[in-house]
Amino acid sequence: MDTDLYDEFGNYIGPELDSDEDDDELGRETKDLDEVDEDEDDDDVGDHDEDHPGMEVVLHEDKKYYPTAEEVYGPEVETIVQEEDTQPLTEPIIKPVKTKKFTLMEQTLPVTVYEMDSLADLMDNSELIRNVTLCGHLHHGKTCFVDCLIEQTHPEIRKRYDQDLCYTDILFTEQERGVGIKSTPVTVVLPDTKGKSYLFNIMDTPGHVNFSDEVTAGLRISDGVVLFIDAAEGVMLNTERLIKHAVQERLAVTVCINKIDRLILELKLPPTDAYYKLRHIVDEVNGLISMYSTDENLILSPLLGNVCFSSSQYSICFTLGSFAKIYADTFGDINYQEFAKRLWGDIYFNPKTRKFTKKAPTSSSQRSFVEFILEPLYKILAQVVGDVDTSLPRTLDELGIHLTKEELKLNIRPLLRLVCKKFFGEFTGFVDMCVQHIPSPKVGAKPKIEHTYTGGVDSDLGEAMSDCDPDGPLMCHTTKMYSTDDGVQFHAFGRVLSGTIHAGQPVKVLGENYTLEDEEDSQICTVGRLWISVARYHIEVNRVPAGNWVLIEGVDQPIVKTATITEPRGNEEAQIFRPLKFNTTSVIKIAVEPVNPSELPKMLDGLRKVNKSYPSLTTKVEESGEHVILGTGELYLDCVMHDLRKMYSEIDIKVADPVVTFCETVVETSSLKCFAETPNKKNKITMIAEPLEKGLAEDIENEVVQITWNRKKLGEFFQTKYDWDLLAARSIWAFGPDATGPNILVDDTLPSEVDKALLGSVKDSIVQGFQWGTREGPLCDELIRNVKFKILDAVVAQEPLHRGGGQIIPTARRVVYSAFLMATPRLMEPYYFVEVQAPADCVSAVYTVLARRRGHVTQDAPIPGSPLYTIKAFIPAIDSFGFETDLRTHTQGQAFSLSVFHHWQIVPGDPLDKSIVIRPLEPQPAPHLAREFMIKTRRRKGLSEDVSISKFFDDPMLLELAKQDVVLNYPM
C-alpha cells in the first residue's frame, strides 16, 4: 500500500480514480429484450456515466433514502403497513399510569397529644375501653362532634383545614354530597374530668334513614349508643327508629342534645323557653324508651349524667357535672358533684339564704339550670356576637380568657368558637357520661354474647367471651367490609370478643350459613396486617386483644356480609354470631346490564363487591336472566350505582326504571279443600289457606315469637295473644319461607283419620315444599305473606321408596299454590312512611303533592319552639319515585322530606280479573292497579301474562272444581 496516497488521518489524497461501478441499470430493464440490446444499453449507460458523472436524471419515485423493511428485518419477517390510525383520538398513544383513589387518607401519621404506645397499652386493659356508636337523625351534628374530638387529640389537624373538617367523611362522594354514606370508626384516647385517660372506639354513622343498615353494623360491635338530637328540631323520624333499634339490640342509651346555639342565635328563644324546649326533648325521648323497653330503670336525665349538651360548631360540650366543675375551678370551695344535682328541674337558688329551694323565692326567680347554665351561655354568645370591641375584652378577662389582638380581629364564627373552646375546655363531660353509663367491654360482654351468639353461653367458649378473656380461644365478629383506597380489595372490620388476633395468624372464617352440621360455609385464611382505624389514617399493630375493634387484611375473600373468625383447630364447637337484623326492608328494585355485553364478567365482579360494601344490599338474578339490585331508597341505590360504575367495575352500565317488590296474600278462606297427588299416585295432600290474624306476621318477623320454642311455650303464646285453640297452637309445623317468615303451616289432621307416624315421616318434605311455595308465589313469583296453610288430610305411602322428597316436595308446593288461588288472592305493595319538615305556608303544597301520588297525611303539627311544621304521611313506594324532587319544586325548596318503609298494604282490585283491559301509556283507575302490577311484573320476569292454573291443579282436582261448579277467572 502506497502511503503517499493517504494523509496522516487515512484520507485518500492521490489522483482521481476511474469509475469501476457495476451497472445497476441491468435490473431495471425488461426481461423481454434480447442479450444484444442489453449489452448495447449497458455500453451506452457506461459511456454516459463516464462522460457526465453525477449528472444522470433520477426520477423522484426512484430515489432511495432508506433501506426497505425487507433489507432491515430480513425476508422471513412479514411487515404490514397501515395507512389509517385505528386508535381513537380520545385514547392516548402511551397511556399514563392510573392511580385509583376514592378515599381521603393521611399520607403520614399525624401528631397526637398522646403517644401511640400509650394507646396500645390501653388496648390491653378492657376496663378502660369504651365501644360507642354515635347515631342520630340526618344533620344533627354527629360528624361535626367527632371533628371536635379529633381536633382535641390532633393539635395540628385544624391548621390544615380551613373549611369544616368532616374528618370521618372519608369518601370523595360523601364530601361532594355533604351526607354520610358509610359508618366510619375512630379510635382516640380521651381524658375525663379527673384527667384519667380512656380508649374510645367511636363509630360515626350516617344520619340518613336510607343508610340505617350502616348503623346496625355499628351497633352490633358497640356496648352503648350516644343519640344525637338537634335542639331546634327535636326528636325526628330517624331518632325514634334509632331509639327502638338500640333498645332491641340491648345497648346502653345516652343522649347528646346538640346545636344548642340554634336556640339562641337562630330561634332567639329566651333562656326560660330554651329550658322548656330542652326538657321537652328529654321527656319525649323517655316516652319513646318506655314504649319500646321493658326495663323500667332505663331513664334519661341530665341529673343522672346520661344527657349532655353540646354545640359542635362552637366547640361547646358539657354535662351538669362538667359545668359545675367550671364553677368549682373558678370560685373554689364548691362541692361540684352536689352542686350538679341541683342544676335541673324545678329547683331555684335563693340568693338571700344562699340555699336551693323547690319553691321560687320570688316571682321573677329563674330555675337553677337557667340561672347558672343558660344565662352565662347566652351572655358569652351575646357578647361575642354583639359587642366585640368595647365590652368583650373586659368580659373575657373576668372569665380568665386571654386572647391576642390577632385573635380578637377574627370573624364572628371563628372568634365565638375560640372563646367557647377556651371557656369550656376539652369534652370531658362527654367522656364522663360514656364512662359512667356505657359499660366497658368486660362488663358488657355477657349481655352482648347472650344477644348475638348462636351457640351456648355456658360452654367454655361462651364463658371466655363473657369474661372478655384475651388469653382465651380466638373469637372475632366482623360486621363491615371496607374497600381499599383503589377499590380492589376489602378489609374486614370487627370486634375481638375473646382471645387475641395476631398478624400472620392462620384463622378459620365462618360465614353466615355455617352450622355444626353443615360446615361448607367456612374457609381457612391467613390474617395479613392488622390496623386500628382512625378515619383517615390507620395505626398498624401486630396484635389486638379482646374488647377492641380491629381492621383485618387478608380474610375478605370468603366473607359476604358478616363473619365469625376463630382458630382453625381446637375450636370445633365454635358457632357463628347472628347475621345483622336490619330495622328497614329493601323494597326498591332496579335491573342492571352492561352497555357492552362482553363486559358482563366485570359487572358481575362489581356486583359482588358492592354486595360486600353495603350491609343490607341484595343482588340476585331473575329467571329471565336480568340482574336485579334491591335497596332501601333512591339515594341508597344512587350511591350503589356510583360505586358499581366508577369504583368496582369501571364500565358503562344501563339501568332500568326503578320498581318495587310486591307480596302476595289472601283475603278469605279457600272456597274448597284443595288436594294434589304425587306423580306416582301413591300420596295425596289436602290443604286450605286462610289469612293470618292482624299483627301476627309482624310478630314473627320481629322475633317476638320463634319457631324454635318448645311446643308448650309456642302454644301458650298463640292461645293467649291470638286466641288460637290449644290443638292448633301446638300443631304449628313451620313458619315460611324461613324461620322468621310471615306465613304459618299448621297440621290440622286428626289421628283418627290420618296415620300421624307416616305423616311425621314426610314432615320435612312437606315443610320444604311449603317454604318453596311461599318464597315464590303463583301470581308473580313474589313472596307470599300473611297466610296460614292448614293440612286437612294426607294419604302417605307405606313404603319409604314411594314417599321420597322428590315425590312429596313438588306436590306440597302445588297444593300450597292451589289452596292459595282458591282463597281470593290479592297483591300487596310496600308503603313508605314520610316525614316532611316545612314552614307553615308550605303545608298545603305538601298535601297536594301527596294526593297526586296516592298518599295521605296522618299527622300535621308544629314543632315546639320553632317556625316549622312536621307533616307525617304514608305513600305507596311505587309512587314515591321523584317525590322529593316534586316536593322541593312545589315548595321552592323549603320542604325537606325523608321516607322509610313502614308496612305492606293490599293493592285495590283483583289481580286475576280478566275483564280488566290494561291500556298502554294510560294511568289506570284504582280498581285496575292490582291487575296492572301483576301483568307488568310477570312480563318483566319473562313469565306468561296470566296465571295458568293447569300447573297447580291436578286433573282430579279440576273435576272436583267442575262438580262444585266453581267459576274461575283463571286461564286453563
Swiss-Prot record:
The modification Phosphothreonine is found at T86. InterPro entries: EFG_II, EFG_III/V, EFG_V-like, EFTu-like_2, EFTUD2_N, P-loop_NTPase, Ribosomal_Su5_D2-typ_SF, Ribsml_uS5_D2-typ_fold_subgr. There is a cross-link at K64 (Glycyl lysine isopeptide (Lys-Gly) (interchain with G-Cter in SUMO1)). Disulfide bonds: none annotated. It is found in: Nucleus. It comes from the Eukaryota. Residues 1-53 are annotated as: Disordered. Residues 17-26, 34-48 have a biased composition (Acidic residues). GTP binds at residues 136-143, 204-208, 258-261. It holds the Pfam family GTP_EFTU_D2. Its main location: nucleus. GO terms for cellular component: cytosol; nucleus; U2-type catalytic step 2 spliceosome; U2-type precatalytic spliceosome; U4/U6 x U5 tri-snRNP complex. Keywords: Acetylation, GTP-binding, Isopeptide bond, mRNA processing, mRNA splicing, Nucleotide-binding, Nucleus, Phosphoprotein, Spliceosome, Ubl conjugation. There is a cross-link at K64 (Glycyl lysine isopeptide (Lys-Gly) (interchain with G-Cter in SUMO2)). The modification Phosphoserine is found at S19. CDD domains: eEF2_C_snRNP, EF2_II_snRNP, EF2_IV_snRNP, snRNP_III, Snu114p. One of its GO terms (molecular function) is GTP binding. The modification N-acetylmethionine is found at M1. GO terms for biological process: mRNA splicing, via spliceosome. Residues 127-409 form the tr-type G domain. Required for pre-mRNA splicing as component of the spliceosome, including pre-catalytic, catalytic and post-catalytic spliceosomal complexes. Component of the U5 snRNP and the U4/U6-U5 tri-snRNP complex, a building block of the spliceosome. As a component of the minor spliceosome, involved in the splicing of U12-type introns in pre-mRNAs. Belongs to the TRAFAC class translation factor GTPase superfamily. Classic translation factor GTPase family. EF-G/EF-2 subfamily. Component of the U5 snRNP and the U4/U6-U5 tri-snRNP complex, a building block of the spliceosome. The U4/U6-U5 tri-snRNP complex is composed of the U4, U6 and U5 snRNAs and at least PRPF3, PRPF4, PRPF6, PRPF8, PRPF31, SNRNP200, TXNL4A, SNRNP40, DDX23, CD2BP2, PPIH, SNU13, EFTUD2, SART1 and USP39. Component of the pre-catalytic, catalytic and post-catalytic spliceosome complexes. Component of the minor spliceosome, which splices U12-type introns. Within this complex, interacts with CRIPT. Interacts with ERBB4 and PRPF8. Interacts with PIH1D1. This is 116 kDa U5 small nuclear ribonucleoprotein component. It comes from Bos taurus (Bovine).
